[in-house]
Amino acid sequence: LSQAALEGRDILFDQNGKYNLVIRRMLETVYTDYQGNRADADFVNLEIYLKRVWFSNGIHHHYASDKFVPAFTPEFFRTALKNVDAAKLPLADGETVDTLCDRIFPVIFDPKVMSKRVNQADGEDLVLTSAANYYDGVTQQEAEEFYNALKNPADDQPVMFGMNSRLVKENGQVQEKVWKSGGLYGAAIDKIICWLEKAFEVAENEVQRAVIEKLIRFYKEGDLHTFDEYSI
């Protein structure tokens, strides 16, 4: 069960912010491969920042949702990145270390960019102004209209729509990408399922097996009614 949870770690990072995995890999590569003075204030502050990112599964505080302010300089980080093996960095196709820095540094260093993981300020579009990666190109109004259309007033066991999906806009249409085997995060979820199936085989009793079986079924199908059964 612990291994199943570990397989989902990167999913949580990505859900908490679109650039979290890229930033974590940049930080970890410098942390492991840096050849300079590790007692230098910039490196020490990078290490502190990385540990906060690890603990919070992203660049925002896990409770307050405020973005962490790095105490190391952009100049230090750029130089450090240019002195590690570029093959270890999360470069997009055709991207150089400099263009990677240009793309990502505003997310790290500019306090106005993605400043809140979850924004709850009155009068603002809470979807567009939140850094959490549950929506892509979708407004709050569009998200509310999409999920309201799915609700059935006659359903005496309503599910929590949107709990296991990302809303995206493709060709001008809002679509739901469900987290499940064969869907969004499918490769990681298949690994979670693999470890849950191993846990099922060594469960101590039928109650444990029944609970694990429901969770496996939920990850395979993405059916929120199954998740309710598992939770209860």
Regions found by a protein language model. Give the residues of each.
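N-terminal helix-rich structural modules
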Residues: 1-163, 167-177, 183-201
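Active-site-proximal, well-structured secondary-structure segments within enzyme catalytic domains
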Residues: 230-232
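Segments forming glycine/polar-rich beta-alpha architectures that bind adenosine-containing cofactors
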Residues: 192, 208-216
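Glycine- and small hydrophobic-enriched segments that form the cores of compact globular domains
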Residues: 223-226
